């Protein structure tokens, strides 16, 4: 779903483990690392979209996590023109971010729950390192999400 300004409505997921590390996935067949995220469907709530993306991208369900917090407003970023294909009015992503606590064992994480997986590798990483490792155009949103949700981390 794309809004009137060309931004795709989206949810982002920050999944933390018991060591205060965050899940970070490498996009399949690319050297690009990011948090799980994905577009909302028409009339889909933020929470339902987040749980759908969590299942599709890393194989987790409601029983595997606890919602700790979420951003109160949309955070957005523009995708560089060199990444865009075609002539649509699409500009970037507009996201609500969720902070989740992972309460199961790592074995529960499954990157192959769909016929088109998003990630081919993953790791637990410090949040600050995730900001450094992601695409530059996304790092601002990662910083904003952390700023708003950081009180829940410690």
Language-model features, listed with the residues they occupy:
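Active-site beta-strand termini and strand-to-loop segments that position acidic
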Residues: 15-18, 27, 100-102
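Charged phosphate-binding loop/patch that engages nucleotide di/tri-phosphates or the phosphate backbone
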Residues: 127-154
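A short gly/proline-enriched turn/hairpin at secondary-structure junctions
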Residues: 34-38
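Acidic, metal-coordinating catalytic segment for phosphate/diphosphate chemistry
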Residues: 1-18, 87-88
